[in-house]
Amino acid sequence: MKVYVSNYLSRSISILDYSTLEFERDIKLDENIYPHNFCIDNRQQLAYIPSSLDGELYVLDLSIGKIIDNISIGGKLTNIALCNDELFISNEDSNSIYILDVKTSNPIGVIGVDNMPHGFDIDSINNRLYVACINSIICIDTISKSICKKIDTDFKSWHIKLDRNKKEIYTSTLDGKV
């Protein structure tokens, strides 16, 4: 098992051994790729890296350490998750979640959400995607591709994490609160 670390400013991804936390290697990315969030497809040994700079989704082959594909989506892409062979990608510019078929790289759809979706967390057991937006948290059913719940908030949600054991949602805000 591995730990993958995004190094935004050095434009690289570090790989550590999970059990020892020993450094194994760095994968240097192209000059215009700044990894912030990414997801791993362990079966295919691929990393999907959304770009907030150029609206591209980069596909990194972890076995050879090279970008093997890029998919033009557009906008300011900020977060990504893999669920049921589909990629869910947040786009702050269009206030939407873009859905892509991982096997074909074809678009499946776009779900409009509230203002500035940035972070999200996926509950793959219940097929739910929880999206942090400014002044709300949106819950999306990943099977029907529809919003099943909206929670209005009086804070600017930025990142979000589910605690499935406690059945709680944690979110950090733009002004540094949890």
Enumerate the predicted regions with their spans:
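Predominantly soluble domains enriched in secretory-pathway, periplasmic, or organellar proteins
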Residues: 1-178
